[in-house]
């Protein structure tokens, strides 16, 4: 059946029907259109999530035991401060900016339009906290002759050296200080970085930067779901329970009985590794071989021969590695012996995707971050066990560094690094 339109041209009835539906939708009378209008777009955060916040003051810095947020950035800086007084000014200023940014508030107005705006404006007129955490760590180089801090250097802090499989780029290594910035959304992370750089032009210079992510649903699980890395395997299954305070005192935090400088108590050693994946090569590798390399089922995350992700592998009943290979990643990283208990660490890694390399390969990988009370017993011991593992054929560490995450800020009269600088 056909109708004539207002110009006298024959028009199919289906087209005319669509026009009627469109008119009803504009009038608010179409149930389908109304339903779509009230639905949130996929992946968007509710207002409650944007206003989620982590406490800033406390014995420890946020961003270490905090359940992983979806977006993350690592930024290493060279410190431009000329003396210890300048360094104190830097740490006080960073503390002030962190306190504001993590708790949120109205964006500052610019009183004189002839001057640069006081805020980048990328979050609008209200800066939502968005579950933001900013964790400040210091590198080995901060304890050189510039500030007279050498006697106070954490005992196990050292410059990152090359392991056999490393292909380190000097431009992506080390730093006087490192910021780990995490939030629910990437725009909040970027806003925080720009705010910090704007306020410290004479005190900090960016050395290197990398941005990372985990899946939105893993972040929303608040630590109950293990993130999946870009090799398709769950990453962090064997992490110790971050909600167990007694265990965290043993694994993560520097304590008084370690004979470290007194100011380090409540802080943590941080190892950072930028690891590039050969994803094209990996994607052409048979599933069975992939699972043998990791020692886990790719879909469930369970140790091979077991049913569930968090099942504990029984290496004693598999001494020849017939079920879980002797050189598998999980068996080398954590042999589950009495001796290996001292090398536990808390992993907080993120995936990255950066474009393509000069050779035309996808530049994807892992921003590996871990925290431990002792760098030598933790990351360094584990990495030595992993030297020569089968996974090395598919991964290439290209940067990173070792740092010490400062203890927390007690209250509004305190500042990050105060115990270090008052010595």
From Swiss-Prot:
SUPFAM superfamilies for this protein: Dimeric alpha+beta barrel
GO MF, one example: peroxidase activity
Post-translational modification: Predicted to be exported by the Tat system. The position of the signal peptide cleavage has not been experimentally proven.
Signal sequence residues: 1-35
Cofactor annotation: heme b
Record PROSITE patterns: DYP_PEROXIDASE, TAT
Binding site for heme b: 236-238, 329, 334-336, 347
Keywords noted in UniProt: Heme, Iron, Lyase, Metal-binding, Oxidoreductase, Periplasm, Peroxidase, Signal
Gene Ontology terms describing biological process: iron import into cell
Enzyme Commission number, as recorded: 4.98.1.1, 1.11.1.-
Cell compartments where the protein resides: Periplasm
Chief localisation class: periplasm
Cofactor comment text: Binds 1 heme b (iron(II)-protoporphyrin IX) group non-covalently per subunit.
Catalytic activity line of the entry: heme b + 2 H(+) = protoporphyrin IX + Fe(2+)
InterPro entries, per the entry: Dimeric_a/b-barrel (IPR011008), Dyp_perox_C (IPR048328), Dyp_perox_N (IPR048327), Dyp_peroxidase (IPR006314), EfeB/EfeN (IPR006313), TAT_signal (IPR006311)
Source organism, top-level taxon: Bacteria
Cellular compartments per GO CC: cytosol; periplasmic space
Subunit structure and binding partners: Homodimer. Part of a ferrous iron transporter composed of EfeU, EfeO and EfeB.
Function of the protein: Involved in the recovery of exogenous heme iron. Extracts iron from heme while preserving the protoporphyrin ring intact.
Family: Belongs to the DyP-type peroxidase family. EfeB subfamily.
Protein name: Deferrochelatase
């Amino acid at each position: 059946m056909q109708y004539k339109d207002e110009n006298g041209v024959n028009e199919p009835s289906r087209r005319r029907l669509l026009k009627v539906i469109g008119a009803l939708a504009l009038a608010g009378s179409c149930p389908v259109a109304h339903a779509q209008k009230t639905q949130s777009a996929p992946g968007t955060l509710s207002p409650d999530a944007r206003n989620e916040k982590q406490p800033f003051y406390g014995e420890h810095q946020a961003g270490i035991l905090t359940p992983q947020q979806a977006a993350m950035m690592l930024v290493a800086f060279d410190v431009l401060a000329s003396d210890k007084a300048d360094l104190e000014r830097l740490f006080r200023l960073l503390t002030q900016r962190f306190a504001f940014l993590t708790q949120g508030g109205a964006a500052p107005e610019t009183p004189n339009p002839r001057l640069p705006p006081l805020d980048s404006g990328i979050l609008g007129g209200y800066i939502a906290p968005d579950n933001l955490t900013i964790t400040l760590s210091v590198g080995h180089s901060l304890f050189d002759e510039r500030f007279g801090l050498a006697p106070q250097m954490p005992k196990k802090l050292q410059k990152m050296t090359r392991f056999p499989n490393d292909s380190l780029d000097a431009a992506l290594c080390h730093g006087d200080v490192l910021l780990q910035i995490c939030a629910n959304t990437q725009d909040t992370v970027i806003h925080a970085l720009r705010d910090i750089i704007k306020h410290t032009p004479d005190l900090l210079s960016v050395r290197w930067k990398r941005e990372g992510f985990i899946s939105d649903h893993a972040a929303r699980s608040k630590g109950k779901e293990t993130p999946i890395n870009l090799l398709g395997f769950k990453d962090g299954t064997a992490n110790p329970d971050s909600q167990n305070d007694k265990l965290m005192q043993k694994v993560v935090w520097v304590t008084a009985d370690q004979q470290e400088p007194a100011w380090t108590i409540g802080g943590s050693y941080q190892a950072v590794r930028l690891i590039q994946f050969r994803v094209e090569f990996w994607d052409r590798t048979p599933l069975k071989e992939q699972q043998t390399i990791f020692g886990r089922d790719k879909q469930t995350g369970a140790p091979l021969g077991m049913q569930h992700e968090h099942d504990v592998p029984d290496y004693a009943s598999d001494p020849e590695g017939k079920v879980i290979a002797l050189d598998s990643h999980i068996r080398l990283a954590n042999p589950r012996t009495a001796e290996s208990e001292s090398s536990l660490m808390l992993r907080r890694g993120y995936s990255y995707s950066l474009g393509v390399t000069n050779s035309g390969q996808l530049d994807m990988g892992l921003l590996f971050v871990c925290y431990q009370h002792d760098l030598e017993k933790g990351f360094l011991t584990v990495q030595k066990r992993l030297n020569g593992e089968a996974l090395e054929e598919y991964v290439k560490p290209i940067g990173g560094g070792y740092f010490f995450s400062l203890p927390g800020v007690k209250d509004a009269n305190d500042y990050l690094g105060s115990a270090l600088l008052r010595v």
